[in-house]
């Protein structure tokens, strides 16, 4: 039962969607920020 609960929590629609959205937005913002910082340093 505990494993099922954990699996349900980890495999829930909201957490997965949030994680996916964050992962999709994070890399882009991080790359953009890094590129901007690199350009500013140059």
Swiss-Prot record:
Alphabetical UniProt keywords: Sporulation
Induction text: Expression is sigma G-dependent.
InterPro entries in the record: SASP_SspL
Region (Disordered): 1-42
Record field: compositional bias (Basic and acidic residues): 21-36
Chief place of localization: other
BP terms from Gene Ontology: sporulation resulting in formation of a cellular spore
Compartments it resides in: Spore core
NCBIfam families cross-referenced by the UniProt entry: SASP_sspL (TIGR03093)
Protein name: Small, acid-soluble spore protein L
């Amino acid at each position: 039962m505990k494993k099922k609960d954990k699996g349900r929590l980890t495999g829930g629609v909201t957490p997965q969607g949030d994680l996916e959205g964050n992962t999709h937005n994070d890399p882009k913002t991080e790359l953009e920020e890094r590129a901007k910082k690199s350009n500013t340093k140059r």
